[in-house]
Curated annotation (Swiss-Prot):
Keywords: Cell wall, Glycoprotein, GPI-anchor, Lipoprotein, Membrane, Secreted, Signal. One of its GO terms (cellular component) is fungal-type cell wall. Its main location: secreted. It comes from Saccharomyces cerevisiae (strain ATCC 204508 / S288c). This is Cell wall protein CWP2. It comes from the Eukaryota. GO terms for molecular function: structural constituent of cell wall. Induction: Down-regulated during anaerobic growth. Residues 72-92 form a propeptide. It is found in: Secreted, Cell wall; Membrane. It is a lipid-anchor; GPI-anchor. PROSITE patterns: PIR_REPEAT_1 (PS00929), PIR_REPEAT_2 (PS50256). Component of the cell wall.
Length: 92
């Protein structure tokens, strides 16, 4: 009974860690907005564009976009798992 408790707690901690590592990446703009990455696939359409005159606008923004590659979720999940294992070890 005690081994199964420790094994299940370890499995839950490992599952949380794997889920946190396999999450899709997002980026956060400096003003607090969060946007998804542009890895989504879209289907191509075969309709012709309407004929019109379009002026090219060059980007003149000096804003920088900082990307957050990881957060504390993985560390929290591992810490929670370690705490749960310590609590289970105390019950032995």
């Amino acid at each position: 009974m005690q081994f199964s408790t420790v094994a299940s707690v370890a499995f839950v901690a490992l599952a949380n860690f794997v889920a946190a590592e396999s999450a899709a990446a997002i980026s956060q703009i400096t003003d607090g907005q969060i946007q998804a990455t542009t890895t989504a696939t879209t289907e191509a359409t075969t309709t012709a564009a309407p004929s019109s005159t379009v002026e090219t606008v060059s980007p003149s923004s000096t804003e920088t976009i900082s990307q957050q590659t990881e957060n504390g979720a993985a560390k929290a999940a591992v810490g929670m798992g370690a705490g749960a294992l310590a609590a289970a070890a105390m019950l032995l």
